[in-house]
């Protein structure tokens, strides 16, 4: 969450962007205060870009941002997740259908990301609490590029739930398919594959 001072800066930046729809400064402020947040509010970003003039919208950065927003909207809460599959450590392809009739929390992480390690600690608590719940499952998708480091992190952090990685880093297909912008991230799915929540806290889960 934003601190009071950060919130005030964001409000000023938003006011400037909305009142200066043709200024290059608006692009800078949009990037600095909204796009670069750990969990961007894409609905707000879309609203602000809609106020921009055609000249700004034709700029490569804004054009790419609009494409990103379009991808994000495809995987917003209430939408059905697209088909994704990745191998686990044994080489078996894992997908949402591997967790049939279960609520599924997909967690995106990497061994090189300190915040992912903190998230793994929270997930261990959730797993311990829900381990016997036959209607709930966890699936970790890693952005590691080194198999040894990935396997060592799984062992070190005692990640007993299903784990997948294709060692492509940020180029792994689910990252683009699911519009993941930062780590750690998560998606909470209903048994039918509908997205019920995104980037949920331990308390919310």
Residue ranges of model-derived segments:
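Thiol/disulfide oxidoreductase modules built on the thioredoxin-like
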Residues: 159, 166-205
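C-terminal structured domains
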Residues: 116, 126, 141, 172, ...
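Generic structural signal for well-ordered beta-strand positions
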Residues: 94-95, 196
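Conserved segment of the thioredoxin-like fold in thiol-based oxidoreductases
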Residues: 131-170, 180-183
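Oxidative protein folding and maturation machinery
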Residues: 1-94, 101, 118, 129-132
């Amino acid at each position: 969450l934003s601190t009071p001072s950060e919130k005030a800066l964001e409000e000023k930046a938003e006011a400037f962007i909305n009142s200066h729809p043709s200024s290059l400064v608006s692009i800078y402020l949009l990037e600095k205060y909204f796009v670069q947040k750990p969990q961007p509010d894409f609905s707000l970003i879309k609203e602000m870009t809609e106020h921009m003039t055609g000249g700004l919208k034709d700029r490569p950065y804004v054009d790419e941002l609009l494409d990103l927003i379009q991808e994000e909207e495809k995987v917003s809460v209430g939408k059905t997740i697209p088909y994704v599959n990745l191998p686990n450590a044994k080489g078996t392809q894992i997908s949402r259908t591997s967790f049939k009739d279960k609520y599924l929390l997909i967690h995106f992480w990497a061994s090189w990301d300190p915040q992912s390690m903190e998230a793994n600690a929270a997930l261990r608590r959730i797993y311990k609490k829900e381990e016997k719940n036959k209607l709930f499952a966890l699936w970790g998708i890693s952005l590691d590029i080194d198999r040894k480091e990935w396997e060592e992190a799984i062992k070190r952090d005692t990640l007993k739930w299903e784990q997948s990685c294709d060692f492509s880093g940020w180029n792994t297909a689910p990252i683009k398919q699911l519009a993941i912008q930062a780590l750690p991230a998560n998606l909470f799915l209903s048994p039918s594959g509908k997205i019920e929540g995104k980037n949920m806290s331990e308390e919310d889960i």
